[in-house]
């Protein structure tokens, strides 16, 4: 059964926003990208369902652009904290079902959370933690934090364990470790 696609509005087409928008579109989702910068919008036109010049601080302009008809919105406005806050507030007022917002620091994070963002992202801190985990342990190829202290980790199996039966490894006997295959 094919995966159901959703529609996404990405407000702010800088490095972070444009990367998210392009990936969502690559997955087959309907994506509108919006930014005040005409050059950023122009670069996205060939790749997205729609790309528009839009002031996300203007609730009426967002409604006119049909942002309220999208399932999920991402506020990826980076440098202008006031614009980020107003865009998040406008999305909530428009009734967008799910709102993710990018924050620049902890205070910004708290404000966006209080405004009703469903998830607030601190990309530099999150990527910094991710990089530190992988640098700390060279056997870790990649990992995903699941929250509450749980992670899925992709590790390089040492040569000495090559060919060993999984049952002989005593995985989980001392730690709460589970093998996924």
Regions inferred by a protein language model and the residue ranges of each:
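Short beta-strand element of Class I
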Residues: 30-32, 99
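Conserved acidic E/D residue at the C-terminus of a beta-strand in Rossmann-like folds
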Residues: 34-36, 103
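Phosphate-bearing ligand-interacting subdomains
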Residues: 42-131, 135-137, 156
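Aromatic pocket-lining residues of Rossmann-like dinucleotide-binding sites
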Residues: 24
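N-terminal Rossmann-fold NAD(P) dinucleotide-binding loop
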Residues: 17-18
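Cytosolic Rossmann-like ligand/nucleotide-binding regulatory domains
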Residues: 3, 7, 11, 34, ...
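Internal, active-site/partner-interface "lid" segment
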Residues: 129-130, 140-159
């Amino acid at each position: 059964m094919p995966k159901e696609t959703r529609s996404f509005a990405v407000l702010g087409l800088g490095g972070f926003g444009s990367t998210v928008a392009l990936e969502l579109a690559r997955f087959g989702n309907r994506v509108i990208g919006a930014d005040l910068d005409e050059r950023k919008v122009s670069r996205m036109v060939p790749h997205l369902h729609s790309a528009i010049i839009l002031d996300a601080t203007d609730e009426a302009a967002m409604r006119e652009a049909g942002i309220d008809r999208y399932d999920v919105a991402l506020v990826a406005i980076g440098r202008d904290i006031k614009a980020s806050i107003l865009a998040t507030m406008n999305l909530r007022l428009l009734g967008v079902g799910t709102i993710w917002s990018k924050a620049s620091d902890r205070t910004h994070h708290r404000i966006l959370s209080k405004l009703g963002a469903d998830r607030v992202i601190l990309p530099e801190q999150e990527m910094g933690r991710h990089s530190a985990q992988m640098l700390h342990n060279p056997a870790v190829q990649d990992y995903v934090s699941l929250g509450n202290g749980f992670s899925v980790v992709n590790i390089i199996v040492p040569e000495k364990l090559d060919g060993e039966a999984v049952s002989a490894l005593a995985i989980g006997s001392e730690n709460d470790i589970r093998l996924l295959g």
